[in-house]
């Protein structure tokens, strides 16, 4: 009997082991199959699939997803035909750049021309291409190009004293993006009328200068002047939005040439919390602004001495040639007198972010380099008011001098492009927006503690920047959230160029302590005529003011 029971138990255990083994094998087989499918799926993944799976914050800094296609085939064929391209391109470059070199010729130079110009035997390498969508009437390509060539470029330089110097341009290293626009599309072969060529982005342009048979440093300042002239010539002859239009089929292609499309008006208001570049005292900041980095198109503000929170309140105008791609660049420098100015920080804003005909009030964070966006150091901020005014009667912006329904500032600031309207634009600069500004200081909140009792005795000093008119509120004792509800009226002679400054002070028996300030242009109140808002205190960790502003305008004109 025991034997039979043992046999039965053995059979049951054996069957259980077999069943368990089969299930384990099936499970392992299923896992292997799933793993194989997963590996196969990864093998089929595209770059776009990877970008969908992982958000950008998980990418290492060295991972870059390129949208460009490789051009090995083009580089192979370009190497073969380069001797012919060299000859044709050299003539084209000479014809395009030489007049611009003469235009930007330094004052110490009497003439500046090309004595020799060939591009050498090394062909450039195209590292990628992409197609830009959105143009129904043409095809736009962008080509990444890198060139470390051996060109033979000699400039014929004649100084004011009559000395001729052959200056060789050597060791050229260039990296950039070229834009080719095939437009307009036509029915005749090759199906486009012209090709527009432009340098869309200049990533790197390095070169050295050498006097043939001499030393360029023998003439102080000549090397720097020639180098700046070359860079300006490249910028003004081929860099976007400038383009070279090459007709393929005979026709009128004047519409493809560069034309101004609008005007950008910029009010440089102020900056705050700038990095101090001086070991003794404070920096002496000034600003440079440009849309295209050319000498005559770059605007410079006045220098504010010994101030890390400068107030400029200056107005500048810039011609816009392509609002969809151009941007305004602001660079803040520390004025070092006879020495080279030191960069404090820079910022930029794309013009496509501006709504035509509407004033945009922005604070831009300053960075060390616009190309590197990982700068976390606090370099300060700059305050701008921007107004983009497109040219042309079809842009929806009406002539400001014939529309009574617009606000005062809109009547002053908007213009069009006809001759009559351009005359109005010139007249606009002589407009004075005069009126009465009514300011009600309502209250403040979260004023910083100023005394040992954990309280403050705040009051507000109001002043007009241009006229110097001043008023002040009463003192509210022992309060970090004071309420004043006091109204002050200021007669403003030129509202477009004046500013309201409100300083908050702590009253003490034997003096006063500065807490913070608010600086307001009159742009918003002139446009809206009346509003109420909160304003944070600059130069203070906490605190804000609630104000009610009202404008009663009377626009007049200077006699001209």
UniProtKB/Swiss-Prot annotation:
Cellular-component GO terms for this entry: endomembrane system; endoplasmic reticulum; membrane; perinuclear theca; plasmodesma
Source species, domain of life: Eukaryota
Residue ranges of every copy of the C2 domain listed in the record: 243-364, 417-535
UniProt cross-references to SUPFAM superfamilies, sorted A to Z: C2 domain (Calcium/lipid-binding domain, CaLB)
Topological type in the membrane: Single-pass membrane protein
Compartment(s): Membrane
SMART domains: C2
Pfam families: C2, SMP_LBD
Residues covered by the SMP-LTD domain: 67-249
GO molecular function, one term: metal ion binding
Record region (Phospholipid binding): 227-523
Keywords: Calcium, Lipid transport, Lipid-binding, Membrane, Metal-binding, Repeat, Transmembrane, Transmembrane helix, Transport
Chain segments annotated as transmembrane: 2-22
Binding-site residues for Ca(2+) 3, renumbered to this chain: 451, 506, 508, 513
One GO-annotated biological process of the protein: lipid transport
Binding residue positions for Ca(2+) 1: 278, 284, 334, 336
Homology family: Belongs to the synaptotagmin family.
Record function comment: May be involved in membrane trafficking.
Entry protein name: Synaptotagmin-5
């Amino acid at each position: 009997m025991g034997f039979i029971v043992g046999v039965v138990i053995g059979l049951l255990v054996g069957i259980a082991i077999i069943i368990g083994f089969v299930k384990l094998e099936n499970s392992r087989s299923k896992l292997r199959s799933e793993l194989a499918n997963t590996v196969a799926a990864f093998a089929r993944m595209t770059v776009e699939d990877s970008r969908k799976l992982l958000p950008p914050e998980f990418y290492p800094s060295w991972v870059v997803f390129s949208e460009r296609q490789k051009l090995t085939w083009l580089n192979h064929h370009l190497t073969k035909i380069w001797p012919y391209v060299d000859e044709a391109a050299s003539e084209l470059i000479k014809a395009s750049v030489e007049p611009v070199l003469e235009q930007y010729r330094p004052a110490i130079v009497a003439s500046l021309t090309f004595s020799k110009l060939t591009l050498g035997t090394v062909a450039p390498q195209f590292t990628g291409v992409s197609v830009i969508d959105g143009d129904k009437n043409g095809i736009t390509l962008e080509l990444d190009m890198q060139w470390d060539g051996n060109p033979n470029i000699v400039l014929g330089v004649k100084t004011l004293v009559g000395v001729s110097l052959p200056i060789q341009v050597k060791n050229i290293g260039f990296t950039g993006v070229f834009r080719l626009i095939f437009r307009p599309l036509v029915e005749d072969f090759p199906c486009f009328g012209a090709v527009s060529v432009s340098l869309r982005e200049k990533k790197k342009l390095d070169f050295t200068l050498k006097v043939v048979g001499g030393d360029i440093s023998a003439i102080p300042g000549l090397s720097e002047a020639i180098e700046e002239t070359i860079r300006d010539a490249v910028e003004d002859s081929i860099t976007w939005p400038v383009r070279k239009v090459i007709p393929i089929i005979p026709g009128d292609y004047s519409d493809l040439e560069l034309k101004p499309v609008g005007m950008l008006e910029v009010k440089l208001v102020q900056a705050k919390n700038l990095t101090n570049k001086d070991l003794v005292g404070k920096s002496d900041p000034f600003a440079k602004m440009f849309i295209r980095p050319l000498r005559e198109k770059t605007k410079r503000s006045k220098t504010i001495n010994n101030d890390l929170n400068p107030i400029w309140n200056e107005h500048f105008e810039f011609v816009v040639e392509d609002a969809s791609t151009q941007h305004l660049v602001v660079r803040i420098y520390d004025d070092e007198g006879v020495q080279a100015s030191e960069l404090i920080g820079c910022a930029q804003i794309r013009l496509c972010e501006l709504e035509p005909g509407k004033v945009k009030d922005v604070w831009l964070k300053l960075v060390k380099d616009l190309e590197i966006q990982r700068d976390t150091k606090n370099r300060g901020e700059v305050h701008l008011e921007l107004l983009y005014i497109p040219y042309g009667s079809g842009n929806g912006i009406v002539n400001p001098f014939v529309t009574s329904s617009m606000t005062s500032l809109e009547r002053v600031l908007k213009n069009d492009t006809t001759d009559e309207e351009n005359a109005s634009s010139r007249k606009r600069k002589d407009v004075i927006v005069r009126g009465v500004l009514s300011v009600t200081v309502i209250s403040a909140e979260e004023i910083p503690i100023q005394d040992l009792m954990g309280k403050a005795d705040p009051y507000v000093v109001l002043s007009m920047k241009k006229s110097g008119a001043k008023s002040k509120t009463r003192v509210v004792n022992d309060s970090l959230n004071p309420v004043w509800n006091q109204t002050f009226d200021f007669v403003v002679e030129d509202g477009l160029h004046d500013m309201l400054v409100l300083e908050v002070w702590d009253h003490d028996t034997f003096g006063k302590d500065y807490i913070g300030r608010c600086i307001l242009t009159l742009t918003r109140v002139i446009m809206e005529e009346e509003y109420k808002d909160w304003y944070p205190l600059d130069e203070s960790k906490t605190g804000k003011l609630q104000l009610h502003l009202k404008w009663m305008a009377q626009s007049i004109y200077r006699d001209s």
